[in-house]
Amino acid sequence: MEAFAVAIQSVINDSGFLAFTTGNAIMILVGLILLYLAFAREFEPLLLGPIAFGCVLANIPRNGFEEGVMALISAGISQEIFPPLIFLGVGAMTDFGPLIANPKTLLLGAAAQIGVFVALGGAMAMGFTAQEAAAIGIIGGADGPTSIYLATKLAPHLLGAIAVAAYSYMSLVPLIQPPVMKLFTTQKEREIVMEQLREVTRFEKIVFPIVATIFISLLLPSITSLLGMLMLGNLFRESGVTERLSDTSQNALDVYKRQP
């Protein structure tokens, strides 16, 4: 009987209930809300679902993640394995045809980076260091892979928070975007259908990633690992002779592309 009592006491002492805090409860509630948005409201379920469930798991005390799953994930990030793989998949899913046909659309992408500077200024105003603010600022561009990559370089201690913030922001774009669009456009403007100006040849689509990689990498060598993988994935897609590599990059590597 005494042995049974000792066993029960051991189970109680090792349980997570004794270490459970108000903060854990709040974050688990946040995770459950995100799970609802992902699966009930279908807000980017492939992206938000794993993040939300991970949020729940991470806030269960004494879960053993740091020695197990998290150790593998942290190694993949710190050794810069996951970000290039993510960019390989993104490149394989990207069609640069509209950009090649109408280079002026590049300005739209440049304008999107305004969010980076807004987030950067906000972080600086809140007292973060220049390096921390720069890592946080990338969240404003809604770019998860780049946020992770830059955080590992400039503010590794903020990596978890930055990754979750960036991917949550990306997942909630379908919720945030409609009211903003309605605020700045009319119904008639929203009904305009964009058409590609001309048909882009296969030769152009193959040459573009090669030339872009060489020129931009010479201009900014530090981004070669990410840019090179992005353009390699696109080359797999557009060459027409590497279907298996393209399919793997787009689908089998989805686990890397979707999770921070």
Where are these regions (language model features)?
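N-terminal alpha-helical transmembrane segments of multi-pass membrane transport
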Residues: 1-68
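Structural signature of hydrophobic alpha-helical transmembrane segments
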Residues: 16-27, 71-86, 132-138, 167, ...
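Alpha-helical transmembrane segments of multipass membrane proteins
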Residues: 32-37, 89, 117, 121-122, ...
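Interfacial helix-loop-helix linkers and transmembrane-helix boundary segments
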Residues: 39-48, 70-73, 94-108, 242-250
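Re-entrant/interfacial helical elements at transmembrane boundaries that shape
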Residues: 49-55, 102, 134-138, 145-156, ...
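Alpha-helical membrane segments and immediately flanking helix-loop junctions
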Residues: 75, 79-80, 87-93, 108-118, ...
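Membrane-embedded hairpin module used as a gating/binding unit in multi-pass transport
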Residues: 165-242
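Residue-level detector of conserved catalytic or cofactor/ligand-binding positions
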Residues: 256-259
